[in-house]
Swiss-Prot record:
Gene3D superfamilies attached to this UniProt entry: 3.40.50.2300, Mannitol-specific EII, Chain A (3.40.930.10), PRD domain (1.10.1790.10), Winged helix-like DNA-binding domain superfamily/Winged helix DNA-binding domain (1.10.10.10)
Gene: manR
Presence of keyword Transferase: yes
Residue positions where Phosphocysteine is found in the record: 415
UniProt-reported outcome of changing residue 570 to A: No reduction in DNA-binding activity can be observed in the presence of EIIBA-Man. Leads to a nearly constitutive ManR activity
Species of origin: Bacillus subtilis (strain 168)
Record family assignment: Belongs to the transcriptional antiterminator BglG family.
Catalytic activity: D-mannose(out) + N(pros)-phospho-L-histidyl-[protein] = D-mannose 6-phosphate(in) + L-histidyl-[protein]
Induction of the gene: Up-regulated by mannose. Is subject to carbon catabolite repression (CCR) by glucose.
Biological process annotations from GO: phosphoenolpyruvate-dependent sugar phosphotransferase system; regulation of DNA-templated transcription
PANTHER family: CRYPTIC BETA-GLUCOSIDE BGL OPERON ANTITERMINATOR (PTHR30185), TRANSCRIPTIONAL REGULATOR MANR (PTHR30185:SF12)
This protein's name: Transcriptional regulator ManR
Amino acid sequence: MEYINTRQKEILYLLLSEPDDYLVVQDFADRVQCSEKTIRNDLKVIEDYLNEHSHAQLIRKPGLGVYLHIEEQERTWLSQQLHTEHFSSRQRSDKERMLHIAYDLLMNPKPVSAKDIAARHFVNRSSIKKDLYAVEEWLKRFDLTLVSRQRLGLKVEGNERNKRKALARISDLIHNTAFTSQFIKSKFLHYEVDFVTKEIKSLQKKHSLYFTDETFESLLLHTLLMVRRIKMKQPISLSPKEMAAVKKKKEYQWTFACLQRLEPVFAIRFPEEEAVYLTLHILGGKVRYPLQTEENLENAVLPKVVGHLINRVSELKMMDFHKDQDLINGLNIHLNTVLQRLSYDLSVANPMLNDIKKMYPYLFHLIIDVLEDINQTFDLHIPEEEAAYLTLHFQAAIERMQGSSETHKKAVIVCHMGIGMSQLLRTKIERKYHQIAVMACIAKADLKDYIKKHEDIDLVISTIALENITVPHIVVSPLLEPGEEKKLSAFIRQLGESHRQKQKTFQMLNNTTPFLVFLQQEAEHRYKLIEQLATALFEKGYVDKDYAVHAVMREKMSATNIGSGIAIPHANAKFIKQSAIAIATLKEPLEWGNEKVSLVFMLAVKHEDQTMTKQLFSELSYLSEQPAFVQKLTKETNVMTFLSHLDY
């Protein structure tokens, strides 16, 4: 993407204000107070900018001068675009600035200096240096290199396919898919975006395709970026084998016809390679419903992968998922698309990745471990984004199973208004609070005897005041009005927290020793710290020597940060001899995935210790919601005092 500086914008404003009227170079030089040579160089930059951003043409006529040939609608849009760029660049957040920088570098075929980037974004060179480092590290995920050439500047090097992948996943930099989508669309005219949207909808309707909203948006952005890259003479390149395989599919004919309808709108020709590339994205797109075609679920590896996944998660969770047909159907549909994407070398974004890792850390990391085995067994590369989606499938199955077979809290209802009102209240509670099992509806006079006989009662819900009751209780009206529903929800939450408080010792305290605690560490990189902690576990006889290298490999597959400055690196349980936990705090927070981490628990936990593992992850989840407590731990300098904080 071509940068234009403030002076060049002023020249372009002049051209826009005098459409179809010739202006001589001297006019520009006088207006912006520079030499004619500088103006001629600026006009070349402006011409490149216009070629990329619009259909406008810069016309030069010897003896007459220069004029801008542009449609009225486009002139208005371009004026607004220049105005918006000028003011919004001063107001961008750090992450948004990084998005702009990454996009500009990927779209710019020419080198650009860090000084120019800093000037464009109105920040100092040191801020830009940090941004460029983050962008450089992110580009490595796509086998792209940010090369710095002396006296020329910075340029992204790598093949076009990887650049397209990076552009499609650019939202990873700021973890805001909606903002990124609007950002890319803003680079095009409204009618261009609308026309592509209409054509993709038409394609869906005509061929009964049921893309998810996420896939639809992805296809729209891929198509728009394809147009821009073709205009920049940056076409995609595919292997003859890939071309031949895709061109046989009916989806190729659909895509080719769709692109032909777009050609007159954008005044370009789509090469066959581009039609094949877009077809790959259609084939790899996620659908809301299974496609009823002969090609559906045709992948021979699919049943093996689904079977392996369900078997291992069932074993590790000690829950039988084989009878949940909703789960099996969902996994078949989802993993069929995943395998398609992998075979076509397509990447996928998951805007919920970090939220899922924080909400369901135990299940997510369990599935990552299972996928590591699946990837090795079937020579696949299923990424963490897919692990997060699979986590949701299994979490839904767990909630279905718990809803039908187990409950969290046993309750008794005390109602003073007879059986009819008691049953109404019972029905309301059971319908609205699935975590409550109402064991009985009784009179106040019978309550004490009932509690003596049923010591496992967790709470009493009463319509009248109660005295001398040892079990937690709450008073509500028989009709359980909306305000009381909130009150009851808060009461149930407090019960959970008080249960947590009764556990006076963290499970992790039972699985560590002072010799495995390292406070105020200074580490250059998270991999170095992982190796240090794994080595400590090995030297104490808890793990095999290979645990360290496999923990780093596992970290590369998916960063183990879980929020609130906490990370939980670990490796496959087959390298563990005895369950143990090594702990480190950091003098300075360390970059860890998409956040900075100060507290690290290296988990070496055998799968056989199921009860302990569940309790451990419950504690970690609790810790991630207690920033003040985490800060207290990370500031501690004495090992024994640190451990005493975990015994309360």
